[in-house]
Swiss-Prot record:
Methylates ribosomal protein L11. GO terms for biological process: methylation. Its EC number is 2.1.1.-. It is found in: Cytoplasm. This is Ribosomal protein L11 methyltransferase. It catalyses: L-lysyl-[protein] + 3 S-adenosyl-L-methionine = N(6),N(6),N(6)-trimethyl-L-lysyl-[protein] + 3 S-adenosyl-L-homocysteine + 3 H(+). The gene is prmA. InterPro entries: Ribosomal_L11_MeTrfase_PrmA, Ribosomal_PrmA_MeTrfase, SAM-dependent_MTases_sf. PANTHER family: ELECTRON TRANSFER FLAVOPROTEIN BETA SUBUNIT LYSINE METHYLTRANSFERASE (PTHR43648:SF1). S-adenosyl-L-methionine binds at residues 145, 166, 188, 230. One of its GO terms (cellular component) is cytosol. Belongs to the methyltransferase superfamily. PrmA family. GO terms for molecular function: protein-lysine N-methyltransferase activity. Keywords: Cytoplasm, Methyltransferase, S-adenosyl-L-methionine, Transferase.
Length: 293
């Protein structure tokens, strides 16, 4: 069945109100899109901010008459009679198949591949991690995840113990194990992330080598040869003493989730405990690495 799509250009202040009104008018779904390619990098705790220029996209059944809805919207003082909008017919598709077709195996470094389960592994002799996109966690497509995967691929992890601080989907933890790590400990504040990491470890036959903890449950004496933390600048700074304590003398560190302009400050801060390397960059994001003093 085809659908009718209504797109309305507005701002972050009015988007929720318009969304509620369109649902009352019979919309079957509402999504918000960025109107001017303005990224939101690090929202405050508990916030789910919208872009200043927001596009409200409403989907209606094909036989819906939108004329009364448009007339109603014209009466809203914050939109006005000549508000910017677009109506178009959307063909029916197998949206699941369309979504799946967008994901392909990706190589990181020389050895490592991240492969969706429905795709054929390009190189059976490579280090292959089977991971499906899902939840709100890393799949390798984000620059910070890619930077961390490339770094792990560059290391000899044979018989090393690794900590994945902020493990999310478990992509870094599972990759480290597939690359030869003896044991990995994953830590995350979100129980859903713990479950996702567990499921992905089981899928890749490394669950028996992965220990997972919420922060309050992590062992007090936990230490590792390698620690990777792909979180954000604020938590990286706040958790720096704990992260440093978790790395053995001479151990290796990688930090990501940082914007380019945040990298130098975080590097300087961590230099209390680590000999820090030059930052690596991908798009607007950075990765810091260092060796424990």
């Amino acid at each position: 069945m085809p659908w009718i799509q209504l797109r309305i250009n507005t701002n972050s202040d009015d988007a929720e109100t318009i969304s509620d009104l369109l649902m009352e008018e019979g919309a079957v779904s509402i999504t918000f899109e960025d109107g001017k390619d303005t990224p939101i990098f690090e929202p405050k705790l508990g916030e789910t901010p919208l872009w200043q220029d927001t596009v409200v996209v409403a989907l209606f059944e094909a036989d819906t008459d939108l004329a009364p809805t448009i007339e109603m919207l014209k009466t809203l003082p914050f939109l006005g009679e000549h508000f910017s909008h677009k109506i178009e017919q959307i063909e029916d598709k197998d949206w699941v198949r369309e979504w799946m077709d967008n994901y392909h195996p990706i190589q990181f470094g020389k050895r490592l591949w991240i492969c969706p389960s429905w795709r054929e592994v390009p190189d059976p002799s490579a280090v292959n991690v089977i991971l499906d996109p899902g939840l709100a966690f890393g799949t390798g497509t984000h620059p910070t995840t890619a930077l961390c995967l490339e770094w792990l691929d560059s290391l000899d992890l044979s018989n090393e113990e690794v900590i994945d601080f902020g493990c999310g989907s478990g992509i870094l933890a599972v990759a480290a194990l597939k690359l030869g790590a003896k044991k990995v400990t994953g830590i995350d504040i979100d129980y859903q992330a713990i479950e996702a990491s567990k499921a992905n470890a089981e899928r890749n036959d490394v669950a028996d080598q992965l220990a997972l903890y919420l922060p309050e449950d992590q062992p007090a004496d936990l230490k590792a040869d390698v620690l990777v933390a792909n979180i954000l600048a604020g938590p990286l700074r706040e958790l720096a003493p704990l992260i440093a304590e978790r790395v053995k003398s001479g151990g290796k560190l990688a930090l990501s989730g940082l914007l380019k302009e945040q990298a130098q400050e975080i590097s300087d801060f961590y230099s209390q405990w680590f000999d820090m390397d030059e930052a690596a960059h991908k798009e607007d994001w950075s990765r810091l690495t260092g060796k424990r003093k």
